Design a protein with these regions (language model features):
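Membrane-interface coil-to-helix junctions
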Residues: 22-122, 142-163, 195, 202, ...
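Active-site-proximal, structured, solvent-exposed surfaces of multi-pass membrane proteins
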Residues: 2-5, 53, 617-833, 838-839
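Membrane-embedded helix bundles of polyisoprenyl
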Residues: 20-21, 111, 115-129, 134-219, ...
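Transmembrane alpha-helical segments
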Residues: 118-126, 165-177, 205-213, 305-312, ...
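Contiguous transmembrane helix-bundle modules in multi-pass membrane proteins
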Residues: 176, 180, 199, 323-343, ...
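Start-transfer (signal-anchor) and selected internal transmembrane alpha helices
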Residues: 1-33, 228, 232, 438-444, ...
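Periplasmic/ER-lumenal interhelical loops and adjacent helix-loop junctions
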Residues: 44, 48-59, 90, 229-315, ...
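Extracytoplasmic/lumenal acceptor-recognition loop(s) of multi-pass membrane glycoenzymes
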Residues: 447-467, 479-550, 582-616, 714-717, ...
């Protein structure tokens, strides 16, 4: 019996893992995703952020670099915070064994594995809960693994560990409440928080409700019983948080400096949509929502309609259980629809796209209820099956009449009707014992697999060209490989695929797109006329003056540059490397009144840059051209050969088209409301440009020519006594500088409390210069300076994590020894009983 039991259990667990994996691989074959073709599964942020960050992580591991800081993106970032937000899954460390050219595939097939593990974890939970190991548990595990949530968000690889761990955390909490055993709960929740704190916030909020629900269902016998349960829940929850403290604390400190670090509680209550509209999204083939609309992605098999109704009618399931689980499910539906609840669930923020990120918990709940109905189906009558079938079909027909969402195609309703009829027929045959159990299981698995394959294939797995993403990588590496590395400088790609190209190709850069982006740098970027938004800033719109201030020594161009003011270095195929002749080091000296004198509040960043040159006593670098405004069009003609820029003064204009008299071709510039200069490049005299917007808004724009002679003046003034870098590594910078009276060392290193600075061996507190950068007030004379980065909260976090793990180990040892003592006593007692019986 034991081997038979294991076979059944393993059968269900293997099916729950391998069927979703096989379905995903089948879809990959159809989509020609590598190695089955030349496409890749780089969807949205996976394309722009995750692939570069995984590349940077792998590079650091393989080259023995610190995981605390990175120079390759954002002018320098707290990598421990970026790691905590994007990379903290323990499975990600396997990337050290992956070759560089397969980083995308490592991510892609890790997603597939995690989808399979999600199904396995859900099935394991249902087996442990029901103490049954039949194949039926796998049906609901497959539904969990290939849910609408996964169809919408499976590319969000950083969330998937939490999806896997949720059933195990729930099982651990049930053991804690019912058996007073908290180790599994603390370990699984600790792993979840460590892997992704953001999704774990939602899990923790759910656990509070679930803890109360478990107490209600179990029944509380006394105040003492209640107090002990609450104390244990709080204690093991704190231990779980403590386990993750080493990763979590640096992340918390870093997020305080982001644009998302503030809270704006909604003042008006708004309902987004009706319950019918939401529940209709349980149908297969419904297009997923990942944009700014609030629709939840809650599909997990259309059979849910049948089973939830059967669950509510089943007399073997207690009324208390039904009330608790149904109430929790309704609360989740309300949370999807009501803005205040939506705001709270998302960590007291409105999500910037990717709505209803907590909906996987709702899916877990409804699948549990569906499984309970399946498990107790023998208690349902044929009449109840008929009522559930009619109710399900009736709801689908009602939804077809009332739902007006764009996500519902013609076939959604008909496929749902057919599938409900098939599942109802299978249940009827099972009820009447007119079908062999093995045949029933196989038929159900086949139909369920077809449904899940169709839904995932229709609503998920978009692709991009793998070749296009990687085509210039080898050439970029070739042009950079022979550059000297004895001092610090930055690069920028003129034509980028992402803002995080520096991380993808491992060179020091300015641009960054990350949820950990510092708000101060975004603000400063806009002031200087380079692109910036809530969680990103880039070199787009940069002038040579900005490049100079940011220590951008080299530009990586696709094709040759016609600008005579940059110096050719080398090229590889169509990738060219040019050197900017005027580049300041990572630090430069300014006078004591520099920061207060520089006015960065001008409407135009051209005025901001010119004001900088004015206060250091040099000529303006951006010279305004004469132009004409005519409704939604602005035109100007270049007065002489040079580098030209256009700035759109109206931030309500998002997209413009620029046409030159030279080629008469429209060039579209998007997101100009992000405050960046439109770089027209180096052009001849007498070229007429027209700038227009198609929204018929009044065009308010200005054109400028850049003056390289003025740039040299500014460079000579700021580089009189430069900061000379003598050594630097992934978290340290050392150098010397000869300061005048009351001069300030202004760096292009983003300010962070984690920097520790020593001036001539004496620890010196740095300050925030220009509200953005690391700055040092120096005394007159030559100084040796050392700067080292250690994230805020790292050492306290290590102590807390170490202490929490130690406490868990001691608890485990204590209960293990206690169990051995009790087992020994029981054995001795049985021996005594046997001896007495023999006498």
């Amino acid at each position: 019996m034991k081997s038979e039991s294991w076979f059944k259990r393993a059968d269900a667990l293997l099916a729950a893992f391998f069927i979703p994996v096989a379905i995903m691989i089948l879809i990959f074959v159809q989509r020609q995703i590598f190695p089955f073709g030349d496409n890749s599964f780089l969807r949205t942020d996976m394309y722009h952020q995750y692939a570069p960050f995984f590349s940077e992580f792998q590079y650091k591991l393989k080259h023995g670099q610190s995981l605390l800081y990175s120079w390759d993106i954002g002018m320098g970032v707290n990598f421990s915070a970026l790691y905590a937000y994007y990379l903290a899954s323990p499975l990600n460390w396997l990337i050290v064994f992956c070759p560089k050219f397969l980083v995308i595939e490592f991510m892609t097939y890790m997603i597939v594995v995690k989808i399979g593990l999600s199904g396995l974890a859900m099935t394991y939970y249902l087996q442990k809960y029901s103490k049954k190991e039949g194949m039926g548990t796998a049906f609901f595990g497959i539904g969990y693994a290939l849910s609408g949530y996964m169809a919408a968000y499976s590319w969000n690889i950083m969330w998937l560990d939490c999806i896997i761990l949720l059933p195990l955390i729930a099982l651990g909490l049930e053991r804690l409440v019912n058996k007073k055993k908290g180790l599994m709960y603390a370990i699984c929740l600790g792993l979840s928080i460590t892997s992704n704190y953001y999704i774990s916030i939602m899990i923790c909020m759910f656990l509070i409700f679930y803890f109360v629900a478990l107490l209600v269902m179990r029944g509380v016998t006394s105040k003492k019983d209640f107090f002990i349960a609450v104390l244990q829940f709080g204690f093991f929850s704190l231990l779980a948080g403590g386990i993750s403290a080493m990763v979590l604390l640096p992340e918390i400190f870093a997020l305080k400096a982001t644009a998302s670090g503030t809270f704006n509680f909604p003042q008006v209550y708004v309902a987004y949509f009706s319950i019918i509209d939401m529940v209709a999204r349980h149908m297969p083939g419904v297009e997923t929502e990942i944009g700014l609309d609030h629709w939840p992605n809650i599909y997990c098999g259309v059979g849910i309609y049948l089973f939830i109704l059967l669950y509510l009618m089943n007399k073997k399931i207690s009324l208390k259980e039904k009330a608790v689980y149904f109430t929790m499910s309704l609360f989740f539906l309300a949370s999807f629809a009501i803005d205040v609840l939506n705001y709270i669930w998302h960590g007291f923020h409105y999500p910037n796209s990717l709505p209803a990120r907590q909906s996987f918990i709702y899916i877990f709940l409804v699948l549990f209820m569906a499984f309970r109905a399946y498990d107790k189906f023998r208690a349902n009558t044929l009449k109840e099956l008929g009522m559930a079938t009619v109710g399900s079909l009736g709801f689908i027909l009602l939804a077809q009449k009332t739902v007006e969402q764009k996500h519902f195609g013609f076939g959604v309703y008909y496929a749902s009707l057919i599938l409900i009829a098939i599942y109802a027929l299978l249940l009827y045959l099972w009820k009447k014992k007119r079908i062999n159990v093995n045949a029933l299981i196989i038929a159900t698995l086949v139909i369920l697999s077809v449904e899940m394959t169709a839904n995932t294939g229709l609503t998920s797995v978009t692709t991009v060209s793998r070749k296009d993403y990687k085509d210039d990588n080898a050439d970029v590496a070739n042009v950079l490989k022979d550059l000297p590395n004895d001092t610090f400088y930055r690069f920028e790609k003129v034509t980028r695929k992402t803002k995080d190209d520096g991380a993808w190709m491992n060179f020091h850069s300015v641009s960054l797109f990350s949820s950990t982006a510092r708000a101060a740098l975004s603000d400063f970027s806009k002031e200087m006329g380079t692109e910036a938004s809530t969680n990103a800033y880039s070199i787009t719109g940069s002038t040579p003056l900005v490049d100079m201030l940011y220590a951008v020594k080299y530009g990586i161009y696709t094709g040759e540059s016609n600008d005579p003011n940059v110096e050719y270095v080398t090229h590889s195929n169509n990738i060219y490397l040019y050197e900017n002749p005027y580049t300041l080091p990572i630090g430069y000296l300014v006078g004591p009144g520099f920061e207060t004198s520089w006015d960065r509040t001008f409407r135009s960043p051209a005025d901001v840059q010119n004001n900088l040159t004015q206060i250091i006593g040099t000529s303006p670098v951006l010279l305004e051209e004469e132009g004409e405004k005519d409704g939604s069009t602005y035109t100007f003609t270049t007065s002489e050969k040079g580098r030209y820029y256009v700035y759109i003064n109206d931030s309500s204009i998002k997209t413009v088209k620029v046409k030159s008299s030279k080629d008469n071709i429209d060039q579209t510039f998007e997101n100009v409301d992000r405050g960046y200069f439109i770089d027209l490049g180096y052009v001849d005299k007498g070229i007429t440009y027209s700038v227009r917007n198609d929204d018929n808004k009044e065009m308010d724009a200005s054109a400028y020519r850049f003056d390289y002679k003025a740039l040299k003046e500014a460079y000579d003034m700021l580089n009189i006594s430069p900061f000379t870098v003598t050594h630097y590594d992934s978290r340290t910078v050392e150098g010397t500088v000869d300061a005048g009276p009351e001069e300030v060392l202004m760096t292009s290193i983003p300010y962070d409390e984690g920097w520790t600075v020593y001036v001539d061996g004496v620890k010196t507190k740095p300050r925030k210069g220009l509200d953005t950068f690391l700055a040092l007030d120096l005394t007159e004379g030559k100084h040796e300076i050392k700067m080292k980065f250690t994230p805020q909260g790292l050492y306290p976090g290590m102590v807390i994590s170490g202490g929490s793990i130690l406490v868990l180990v001691l608890i485990a040892v204590f209960f293990n020894r206690r169990k051995k003592v009790l087992d020994t006593k029981e054995e001795n007692h049985q021996e005594v009983l046997q001896e007495n019986a023999q006498k």
